[in-house]
């Protein structure tokens, strides 16, 4: 790769669900001899991975958090400032194409690309198009989705939409090579509980009580790994210590792909990235969609796996310690069912998404 190689700008919100697919595409484009840079917000600076600080451009941005006139005016001002900064970035870097991965931090660079005449496209990993991508969809040349049928009911957009899957970073592809081995009847049952990049308090509220309600014979089998917010750590640990559960508690896992592969059952939120990774690696799950979302994207995401009999979807209002204990007990008693769920999850996964998306980027850029 030389300094004269075409440059592709990757725009993503500053959370793992947006950054990880961007990273996976970046790896593939670099393999093909292209240069890449990331345009994002300040949150991305704390993530390690492909994008070092000298490969990241931070532009002003704001998420629509309120419909009040003052909040909307502030958001519009910041997005306008960000678009101007991104336009200057386009003039300086002269990218061959810009691709957005969702989140409001992608709005300024994608609008700037349109103003600068730079070919652009978006990728959406959700079963429902996100709000930022929905806004941008009319302004880009191409749309890539992880799942089929996302825009089938929108003739104006479906004609420029291609289903490619969710690009997987190298660590996920490595984990996907680990076959699923169902737990033996009296052997260890490895349970992983995660709640997204920030952790989910509901897991700390519900899971310890569910473990306490299991038959004592199952306590000795459990090997539990749980993501717990620091402020919840003491109360969660106290329950597991009292029950003598073999438990590892951490506020964040830097090696989550390997941990997904090492466990028999995963309890998690159903963000697009999590659902795609569970499918790619092929692991059974109990999914608890984040409530309150305007477009109910996590509910739809979880449905992709629950409809395939690869996961159990529980809405948060039904996610009680009693319900969870019942589900864990039933699955622990049916290792054959766990194996079938793992197989169904793997069948729903797609491991070549980064290659397919790279092909679309190159085609859109006319390279």
From Swiss-Prot:
Membrane topology (UniProt): Peripheral membrane protein
Binding-site residues, UDP-N-acetyl-alpha-D-glucosamine: 15-17, 126, 169, 197, 298
Keyword Membrane: yes
Highest taxon of source: Bacteria
GO biological process, any: peptidoglycan biosynthetic process
Molecular-function annotations in GO: UDP-N-acetyl-D-glucosamine:N-acetylmuramoyl-L-alanyl-D-glutamyl-meso-2,6-diaminopimelyl-D-alanyl-D-alanine-diphosphoundecaprenol 4-beta-N-acetylglucosaminlytransferase activity; undecaprenyldiphospho-muramoylpentapeptide beta-N-acetylglucosaminyltransferase activity
Pfam family, one: Glyco_tran_28_C
Record field: catalytic activity: di-trans,octa-cis-undecaprenyl diphospho-N-acetyl-alpha-D-muramoyl-L-alanyl-D-glutamyl-meso-2,6-diaminopimeloyl-D-alanyl-D-alanine + UDP-N-acetyl-alpha-D-glucosamine = di-trans,octa-cis-undecaprenyl diphospho-[N-acetyl-alpha-D-glucosaminyl-(1->4)]-N-acetyl-alpha-D-muramoyl-L-alanyl-D-glutamyl-meso-2,6-diaminopimeloyl-D-alanyl-D-alanine + UDP + H(+)
Pathway info: Cell wall biogenesis; peptidoglycan biosynthesis
EC number(s) recorded for this UniProt protein: 2.4.1.227
Record's subcellular location: Cell inner membrane
GO CC aspect terms: plasma membrane
Predominant cellular place of this UniProt entry's protein: membrane
Function comment: Cell wall formation. Catalyzes the transfer of a GlcNAc subunit on undecaprenyl-pyrophosphoryl-MurNAc-pentapeptide (lipid intermediate I) to form undecaprenyl-pyrophosphoryl-MurNAc-(pentapeptide)GlcNAc (lipid intermediate II).
Protein's recorded name: UDP-N-acetylglucosamine--N-acetylmuramyl-(pentapeptide) pyrophosphoryl-undecaprenol N-acetylglucosamine transferase
């Amino acid at each position: 790769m030389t300094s004269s190689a075409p440059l592709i700008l990757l725009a993503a919100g500053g959370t793992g669900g947006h950054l990880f697919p961007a990273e996976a595409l970046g790896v593939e484009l670099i393999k093909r001899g292209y240069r890449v840079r990331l345009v994002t917000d300040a949150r991305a600076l704390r993530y390690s991975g492909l994008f070092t600080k000298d490969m990241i451009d931070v532009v002003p941005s704001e998420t629509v958090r309120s419909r009040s006139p003052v909040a909307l005016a502030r958001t519009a001002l910041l997005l306008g400032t960000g678009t101007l900064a991104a336009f200057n970035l386009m003039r300086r870097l002269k990218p061959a194409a810009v691709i957005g991965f969702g989140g409001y931090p992608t709005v300024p660079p994608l609008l700037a690309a349109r103003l600068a005449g730079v070919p652009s496209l978006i990728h959406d990993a959700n079963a429902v198009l996100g709000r930022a991508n929905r806004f941008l969809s009319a302004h880009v040349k191409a749309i890539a989705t992880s799942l089929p049928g996302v825009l089938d009911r929108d003739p104006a957009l479906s004609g420029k939409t291609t289903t490619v899957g969710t690009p997987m970073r190298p660590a996920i592809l490595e984990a996907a090579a680990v076959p699923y081995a169902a737990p033996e009847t009296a052997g260890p049952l490895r349970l992983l509980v995660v709640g997204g990049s920030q952790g989910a308090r509901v897991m700390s509220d519900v899971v310890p009580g569910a473990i306490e309600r299991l038959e004592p014979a199952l306590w000795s089998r459990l090997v539990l790994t749980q993501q717990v917010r620091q402020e919840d750590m003491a109360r969660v640990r106290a329950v597991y210590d009292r029950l003598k559960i073999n438990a590892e508690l951490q506020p964040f896992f830097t090696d989550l792909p390997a941990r997904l592969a090492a466990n028999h059952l995963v309890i998690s939120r159903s963000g697009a990235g999590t659902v795609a990774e569970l499918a790619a690696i092929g692991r059974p799950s109990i999914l608890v969609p984040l409530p309150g979302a305007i477009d109910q994207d996590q509910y739809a995401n979880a449905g992709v796996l629950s409809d395939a009999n690869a996961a159990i979807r529980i809405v948060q209002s039904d996610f009680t310690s009693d319900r969870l204990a019942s589900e864990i007990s039933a699955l622990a008693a049916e290792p054959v069912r766990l194996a079938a769920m793992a197989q169904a999850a793997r069948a729903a996964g797609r491991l070549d998404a980064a290659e397919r998306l790279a092909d679309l980027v190159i085609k859109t850029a006319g390279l």
